[in-house]
């Protein structure tokens, strides 16, 4: 029931995805060969959300792995959980997209896309009642951004009524991995605005900050960053996988979080953030969790929620706790900080409570917020985009793959529209429309 097909695209997507499967397998008591070694029936009760039971009681992830070069796939296959995946579900090319969105979306990616869709179709057909798709990818490179968005639009055509959720790694403000990031990201956002249902915005810099500041790691690796992301990813779907007092799923999340169809870019956070060794020593209360979860330092993307207002927010608690306390804490946060929530959506937080906490913790919470502050992120990318596009720098790499400059201009204006929409709703108050209505008569 309620299965989710997981897709990972490009190097970043595959590395986050691999970590995610480690976390999920751990929660469900599945070892590296796919055999169940858990200690509770609850782990098996709804394991079919992410796993398919194969012959001999092996559990196989409903995962599709794709990339335009074999390197990352090989390291996933050689990694700790590499033997878990279905060998046919690794789809890769040999050429690589070379950080070029056009290669991923129009040339190299377009050649590979049909074989990816075949695998996706096969996974979807193996589901009783498909809830939707979740995709991990980055927007700065070529494959995850170009081919990832191509796949999203193809899946959209074929499964229009299924939820499409993406975990998208945006380019960071100060650290850049690729010079052409602003181009790739802007072209991708152009696609995500139209074709995705919910986009969880992640950003390496914010993750590094969490590792330095909160976890006190001196030299965080990508493994540490991806561990943070997968903790939050596991929290988003925990209500589907474990029994709880108050459930949420991808569709409920979408309905509660998206007031206007284009504004579906969310900040995610996770609490408690404790370094790996020190988890066991103190139990947190619901109050502390709530406080930590709304803290700007907890957000996995580099926009400060205090610079905008929350249109909506959703908190997914995990562990044994009283729902009454959860409700009280959530409404207390809203009353205390009412200026940070738009007043024209009363009660704009949703909470859910799932009984099973993540491994090693007594209680935890995943936070998903739809805040107007996310416009900072788009503004930043857009400024970098404009600076390069004005000089037509690096454009020949894209036009050489058959792209048109028009497409860049469209993507740019779509992103700027998005920013001004967020700005408009940030400033809107209840009284705005009242005046307009008087004028209508």
From Swiss-Prot:
<feature type="binding site">
    <location>
        <position position="11"/>
    </location>
    <ligand>
        <name>GTP</name>
    </ligand>
</feature>
<feature type="binding site">
    <location>
        <position position="204"/>
    </location>
    <ligand>
        <name>GTP</name>
    </ligand>
</feature>
<dbReference type="InterPro" id="IPR000217">
    <property type="entry name" value="Tubulin"/>
</dbReference>
<dbReference type="InterPro" id="IPR023123">
    <property type="entry name" value="Tubulin_C"/>
</dbReference>
<dbReference type="InterPro" id="IPR003008">
    <property type="entry name" value="Tubulin_FtsZ_GTPase"/>
</dbReference>
<dbReference type="GO" id="GO:0005200">
    <property type="term" value="F:structural constituent of cytoskeleton"/>
</dbReference>
<dbReference type="Pfam" id="PF00091">
    <property type="entry name" value="Tubulin"/>
</dbReference>
<feature type="binding site">
    <location>
        <position position="69"/>
    </location>
    <ligand>
        <name>GTP</name>
    </ligand>
</feature>
<dbReference type="GO" id="GO:0005737">
    <property type="term" value="C:cytoplasm"/>
</dbReference>
<dbReference type="Pfam" id="PF03953">
    <property type="entry name" value="Tubulin_C"/>
</dbReference>
<dbReference type="GO" id="GO:0005874">
    <property type="term" value="C:microtubule"/>
</dbReference>
<keyword id="KW-0342">GTP-binding</keyword>
<dbReference type="GO" id="GO:0003924">
    <property type="term" value="F:GTPase activity"/>
</dbReference>
<dbReference type="GO" id="GO:0005525">
    <property type="term" value="F:GTP binding"/>
</dbReference>
<feature type="binding site">
    <location>
        <position position="142"/>
    </location>
    <ligand>
        <name>GTP</name>
    </ligand>
</feature>
<dbReference type="GO" id="GO:0007017">
    <property type="term" value="P:microtubule-based process"/>
</dbReference>
<dbReference type="InterPro" id="IPR017975">
    <property type="entry name" value="Tubulin_CS"/>
</dbReference>
<comment type="function">
    <text>Tubulin is the major constituent of microtubules, a cylinder consisting of laterally associated linear protofilaments composed of alpha- and beta-tubulin heterodimers. Microtubules grow by the addition of GTP-tubulin dimers to the microtubule end, where a stabilizing cap forms. Below the cap, tubulin dimers are in GDP-bound state, owing to GTPase activity of alpha-tubulin.</text>
</comment>
<dbReference type="InterPro" id="IPR018316">
    <property type="entry name" value="Tubulin/FtsZ_2-layer-sand-dom"/>
</dbReference>
<dbReference type="InterPro" id="IPR008280">
    <property type="entry name" value="Tub_FtsZ_C"/>
</dbReference>
<feature type="binding site">
    <location>
        <position position="226"/>
    </location>
    <ligand>
        <name>GTP</name>
    </ligand>
</feature>
<dbReference type="InterPro" id="IPR002453">
    <property type="entry name" value="Beta_tubulin"/>
</dbReference>
<comment type="subunit">
    <text>Dimer of alpha and beta chains. A typical microtubule is a hollow water-filled tube with an outer diameter of 25 nm and an inner diameter of 15 nM. Alpha-beta heterodimers associate head-to-tail to form protofilaments running lengthwise along the microtubule wall with the beta-tubulin subunit facing the microtubule plus end conferring a structural polarity. Microtubules usually have 13 protofilaments but different protofilament numbers can be found in some organisms and specialized cells.</text>
</comment>
<dbReference type="GO" id="GO:0046872">
    <property type="term" value="F:metal ion binding"/>
</dbReference>
<comment type="similarity">
    <text>Belongs to the tubulin family.</text>
</comment>
<dbReference type="InterPro" id="IPR013838">
    <property type="entry name" value="Beta-tubulin_BS"/>
</dbReference>
<keyword id="KW-0547">Nucleotide-binding</keyword>
<dbReference type="InterPro" id="IPR036525">
    <property type="entry name" value="Tubulin/FtsZ_GTPase_sf"/>
</dbReference>
<feature type="binding site">
    <location>
        <position position="138"/>
    </location>
    <ligand>
        <name>GTP</name>
    </ligand>
</feature>
<keyword id="KW-0206">Cytoskeleton</keyword>
<feature type="binding site">
    <location>
        <position position="143"/>
    </location>
    <ligand>
        <name>GTP</name>
    </ligand>
</feature>
<feature type="binding site">
    <location>
        <position position="69"/>
    </location>
    <ligand>
        <name>Mg(2+)</name>
    </ligand>
</feature>
<keyword id="KW-0493">Microtubule</keyword>
<feature type="binding site">
    <location>
        <position position="144"/>
    </location>
    <ligand>
        <name>GTP</name>
    </ligand>
</feature>
<keyword id="KW-0460">Magnesium</keyword>
<keyword id="KW-0479">Metal-binding</keyword>
<dbReference type="InterPro" id="IPR037103">
    <property type="entry name" value="Tubulin/FtsZ-like_C"/>
</dbReference>
<keyword id="KW-0963">Cytoplasm</keyword>
<protein>
    <recommendedName>
        <fullName>Tubulin beta chain</fullName>
    </recommendedName>
</protein>
């Amino acid at each position: 029931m309620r299965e989710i097909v997981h897709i990972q695209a490009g190097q970043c997507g595959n590395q986050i995805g691999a970590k995610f499967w480690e976390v999920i397998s751990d929660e469900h008591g599945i070892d590296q060969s796919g055999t169940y070694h858990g200690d509770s029936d609850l782990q098996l009760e709804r394991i079919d959300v992410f796993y398919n039971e194969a012959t001999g009681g092996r559990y196989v992830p409903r995962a599709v792995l794709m990339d335009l070069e074999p390197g990352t796939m090989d390291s996933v296959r050689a990694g700790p959980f590499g033997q878990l995946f279905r060998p046919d579900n690794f789809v890769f090319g040999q050429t690589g997209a070379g950080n070029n969105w056009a290669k991923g979306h129009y040339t190299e990616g377009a050649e590979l896309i049909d074989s990816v869709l075949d695998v996706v179709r096969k996974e979807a057909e193996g589901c009783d009642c498909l809830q939707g798709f979740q995709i991990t990818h980055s927007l700065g490179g070529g494959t995850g951004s170009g081919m990832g968005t191509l796949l999203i639009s193809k899946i959209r055509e074929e499964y229009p009524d299924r939820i499409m959720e993406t975990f998208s790694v945006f380019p960071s403000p100060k650290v850049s991995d690729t010079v052409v990031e602003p181009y790739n990201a802007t072209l991708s956002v152009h696609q995500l605005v139209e074709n995705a249902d919910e986009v969880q915005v992640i950003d390496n810099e914010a993750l590094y900050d969490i590792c330095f500041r909160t976890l006190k790691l001196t030299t965080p690796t990508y493994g540490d960053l991806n561990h943070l992301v997968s903790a939050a990813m596991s929290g988003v779907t925990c209500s589907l996988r474990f029994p709880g007092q108050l459930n949420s799923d991808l569709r409920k999340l979408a309905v509660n979080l998206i007031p206007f169809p284009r504004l579906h870019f969310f900040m995610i956070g996770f609490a408690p953030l404790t370094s790996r060794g020190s988890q066991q020593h103190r139990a947190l209360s619901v109050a502390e969790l709530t406080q930590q979860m709304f803290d700007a330092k907890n957000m996995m993307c580099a926009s400060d929620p205090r610079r905008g207002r929350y249109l909506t927010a959703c908190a997914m608690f995990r562990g044994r706790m009283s729902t009454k306390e959860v409700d009280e804490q959530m409404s207390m946060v809203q009353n205390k900080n009412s200026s940070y929530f738009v007043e024209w959506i009363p009660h704009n937080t949703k909470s859910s409570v799932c009984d099973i906490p993540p491994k090693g913790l007594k209680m935890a919470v995943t936070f998903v917020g739809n805040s107007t502050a996310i416009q900072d992120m788009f503004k930043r990318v857009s400024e970098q985009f404009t600076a390069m596009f004005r000089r037509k720098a690096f454009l020949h790499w894209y036009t050489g793959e058959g792209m048109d400059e028009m497409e860049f201009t469209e993507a740019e204006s779509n992103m700027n529209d998005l920013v001004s929409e967020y700005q408009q709703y940030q400033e809107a108050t209840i009284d705005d429309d009242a005046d307009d209505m008087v004028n209508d008569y």
